[in-house]
């Protein structure tokens, strides 16, 4: 047992006895769950006649969050600070016993966690070290993190069809979408947590299509070579009415060459521009037009939507069927179920540009399709090989317009209209 030095004793003339006073180690607590103990110590008292005194051994550890704290933010982090002592080891564990990582500074006086905490969990911090007297020192503390009413998981997407991370390069018309799996009550709070950085600097803004979807686009088409980086720091943040972010999102991409195709409904021709230069004029056949009401009361039309479409995805072969929009009777003259080659999807409602070798006489002369842009074999191969997701296919001269929510249809809106969709 380690015993502190004895106090000096007084020698009295004529008295042959000496009184020795022994100091005794004592224990104290820091809150209900922060326990202090010097290993090897005992308790007791010493003193002279008429009273007793207790001496506490030096050194202790201070905890942040405080012992027994509740509703702790998962972003606050955990700090252990040594006072009149040094830290040797720190164990921060969740209820499953998993260790949370942290760093101890060089002088062994401060330890800080380096991982985010989990929601609604009780954590235990166990610290061991040595006090300034060279004695072992141990303390523990417990705290509980906030338990949200509900959580929402955000997704960083290039479109309805694909996550942004699936590609590293996109065309000049690429936008950035954040999807939430729960409706966000406080859109402004969520939008403040979003950041887009571009190199070179590019003006852009966010537009809320719904409480579950917000989209960023630049004021003008992105310049080739631009790097776009986006982050959404939602984890640990209240997005309204106790709905907290379940995770952060981040991603980036680089803008490829400028590739823009402009299809004219009147001339039945499509001009293709690469980096601002017209490189090809392609005979096409667009949607034949007309509207009909289906048995369920819904209405469909066979126009190609006017406006700037963004290429969403490509496939060497795609099954296309009229059943996708309700025409299921094989006897119906508008029924079809075919395997189509060299397809590039440009809207959620089934618009593509693709090879169409069955109506070549109509290319450049008449609109006969069900809404797609029909192209001959040689030109469709070139378009398929040349155009990539994020490239622009603009349609002009039809009586129906693309919806902002149809694919990446936000380019249909003016910049002033787009800015009105911001929550800030």
Question: Model-predicted segments: where are they?
Answer:
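Acidic, low-complexity Ser/Thr/Gly/Pro-rich repeat segments typical of extracellular/periplasmic
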Residues: 2-257, 284
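Conserved beta-strand and immediately adjacent loop positions that scaffold enzyme active sites
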Residues: 89, 126, 193, 269, ...
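A short, structured loop/turn motif at beta-sheet edges
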Residues: 132-133, 148, 221-226, 277, ...
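Short peripheral tails and domain-boundary helices/loops at the edges of structured domains
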Residues: 151-153, 163, 259-267, 412-424
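Exported/periplasmic cell-wall-interacting domains
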Residues: 172, 303, 321-424
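Structured segments of extracytoplasmic/periplasmic soluble domains
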Residues: 179, 183, 314-318, 382-386, ...
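Short, glycine/acidic-rich beta->alpha junctions
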Residues: 214, 254-255, 262-265, 374-379
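Gly/Pro-biased beta-strand-loop elements
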Residues: 243-361
């Amino acid at each position: 047992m380690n015993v502190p030095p004895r106090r000096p004793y007084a020698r009295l003339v004529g008295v042959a006895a000496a009184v020795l006073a022994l100091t005794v180690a004592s224990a104290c607590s820091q809150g209900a769950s922060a326990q202090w103990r010097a290993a090897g110590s005992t308790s007791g008292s010493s003193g002279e006649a008429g009273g007793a005194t207790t001496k506490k051994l030096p050194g202790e550890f201070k905890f942040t969050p405080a012992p027994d704290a509740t509703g702790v933010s998962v972003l606050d982090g955990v700090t252990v600070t040594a006072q009149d002592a040094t830290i040797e080891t720190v164990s921060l564990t969740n209820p499953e016993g998993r260790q949370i990582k942290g760093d101890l500074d060089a002088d062994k006086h401060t330890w800080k966690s380096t991982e985010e905490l989990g929601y609604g969990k009780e954590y235990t911090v166990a610290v061991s070290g040595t006090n300034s007297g060279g004695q072992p020192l141990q303390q523990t503390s417990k705290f509980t993190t906030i338990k949200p009413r509900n959580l929402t998981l955000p997704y960083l997407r290039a479109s309805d069809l694909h996550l942004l991370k699936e590609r590293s390069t996109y065309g000049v018309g690429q936008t950035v979408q954040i999807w939430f799996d729960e409706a966000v009550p406080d859109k402004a709070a969520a939008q403040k947590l979003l950041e887009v950085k571009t190199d070179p600097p590019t003006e852009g803004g966010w537009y809320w299509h719904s409480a579950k979807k917000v989209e960023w686009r630049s004021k003008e088409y992105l310049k080739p070579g631009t790097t776009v980086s986006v982050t959404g720091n939602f984890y640990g943040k209240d997005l309204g009415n106790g709905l907290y972010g379940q995770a952060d999102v981040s991603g980036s991409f680089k803008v490829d060459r400028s590739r823009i195709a402009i299809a004219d409904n009147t001339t039945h021709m499509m001009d293709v521009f690469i980096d601002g230069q017209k490189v090809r004029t392609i005979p096409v056949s667009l949607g034949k037009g007309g509207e009909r009401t289906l048995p369920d009361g819904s209405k469909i039309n066979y126009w190609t939507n006017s406006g700037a479409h963004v290429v969403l995805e490509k496939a060497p072969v795609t099954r296309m069927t009229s059943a996708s929009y309700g025409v299921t009777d094989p006897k119906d003259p508008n029924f079809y179920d075919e395997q189509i080659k060299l397809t590039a999807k440009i809207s959620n409602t089934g618009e593509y540009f693709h090879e169409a070798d069955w109506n070549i006489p109509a290319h450049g002369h008449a609109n006969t399709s069900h809404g797609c842009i029909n192209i001959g074999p040689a030109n469709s191969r070139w378009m398929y090989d040349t155009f990539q997701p994020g490239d622009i296919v603009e349609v002009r001269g039809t009586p129906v317009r693309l919806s902002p929510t149809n694919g990446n249809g936000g380019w249909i809106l003016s910049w002033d209209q787009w800015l009105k969709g911001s929550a800030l």
